[in-house]
């Protein structure tokens, strides 16, 4: 029975879209990692709580097939702030997040990072002293 569960989760992972703009923060990537860790032995993995496993699969399958989007349609594709889906995608992209983190740093910290000598930049004779 665990072989069937394993195959169902693999199929779900194949169907789940990857968002390349969110490197390391993508739900599809996280899901694949969790399935790989939960089914370490592949089809031979013994599942301690089969009911919980089935419930988790059903929940993820409903999300993937947009059951809730169809059940609760929205008049507009905007958030409560009025930001559109495309604007949200741009703001949450990894490049934008890194740029925002850079802007959050103070002037002093930014200057110190740029002009401080790094250990690998120092010649070996000076590093030993």
Swiss-Prot record:
Residues 1-13 form a transit peptide. Pfam families: UQCC2_CBP6 (PF20180). Keywords: Mitochondrion, Mitochondrion nucleoid, Transit peptide. The keyword Transit peptide applies. GO terms for cellular component: mitochondrial inner membrane; mitochondrial intermembrane space; mitochondrial matrix; mitochondrial nucleoid; mitochondrion. Required for the assembly of the ubiquinol-cytochrome c reductase complex (mitochondrial respiratory chain complex III or cytochrome b-c1 complex). May play a role in the modulation of respiratory chain activities such as oxygen consumption and ATP production. May be involved in cytochrome b translation and/or stability. It comes from Danio rerio (Zebrafish). This is Ubiquinol-cytochrome-c reductase complex assembly factor 2. InterPro entries: UQCC2. It is found in: Mitochondrion matrix, Mitochondrion nucleoid; Mitochondrion. GO terms for biological process: mitochondrial respiratory chain complex III assembly; positive regulation of mitochondrial translation; regulation of insulin secretion; regulation of oxidative phosphorylation; regulation of skeletal muscle cell differentiation. It comes from the Eukaryota.
